[in-house]
Structure formats: structure tokens, C-alpha cells
Amino acid sequence: MARVKGGTVTRARRKKWIKLAKGYFGHKSVGYKVAKQAVVKSWTYAFRDRKQVKRNFRKLWIARINAAVRPHGLSYSQFINGLKKAEVLINRKMLSELAINQPQTFEKLVKLVQGK
């Protein structure tokens, strides 16, 4: 019986990795070994950055809220503490949206916190 080297299976497997590396720069989109390494690394980055997106958005919302309450003589932490004491349950994303899109409503919240 003749030896079967499995060329079609190997080619298909390598082609799959090359296809996943489509759009990569240089040899990463052509060479099998480098393409496979690049794809696996990109999956690692994607996994890590899916977690970081959540952190980054929270940082952005906090920065926006802080920028909106500073002109009223409050810091971010004082504002959030005041909201908790006033039993206002609005998350940071919504507070950020209010500060940008509806400044009058946001000012009412600030006045509520200040006790005016």
C-alpha cells in the first residue's frame, strides 16, 4: 500500500490560517507560520481589549461628569456622594449623557446635591 502524505489536508489547514490573516501587513498575511502567530496574538489582544473597553468607557463617563460639575464648585466624588445621600439612582453613563445633551436637567441634579 502506498504512503499517503496528506497534502490536501495540510494545505486546507494552512489555507484556513492564511484566510484568517487576510488584511495583515507583509509576510503576516502570506507566510503560514507568521500568519498563525499573528492571528493567535490578535485573538489575545481582542480578548484583553474587550475587557478594557468597559474600563475605558467608565473613565470617560467619570471625566465628563467631573468636567460638568466643576463649574458648580463640586468635585466628582462630592457629586456622586451627594447623589447617593439624596437616593438618586442614575448610573454614570446616564449622568454623562445628561451632562452633554441635557445640561438643564443635569444642573437640577447638581442643585439637588448642593441643597439649593
From Swiss-Prot:
Matching InterPro entries: Ribosomal_bL20 (IPR005813), RIBOSOMAL_L20_CS (IPR049946), Ribosomal_protein_bL20_C (IPR035566)
Keyword RNA-binding (UniProt): yes
Record's GO cellular component terms: ribonucleoprotein complex; ribosome
Keywords of this entry: Ribonucleoprotein, Ribosomal protein, RNA-binding, rRNA-binding
Pfam family, any one: Ribosomal_L20
Gene Ontology biological process terms in this record: ribosomal large subunit assembly; translation
A GO term, aspect molecular function: structural constituent of ribosome
Record-stated family: Belongs to the bacterial ribosomal protein bL20 family.
Described function: Binds directly to 23S ribosomal RNA and is necessary for the in vitro assembly process of the 50S ribosomal subunit. It is not involved in the protein synthesizing functions of that subunit.
Name listed for the protein in its UniProt record: Large ribosomal subunit protein bL20
Name of the gene this protein is made from: rplT
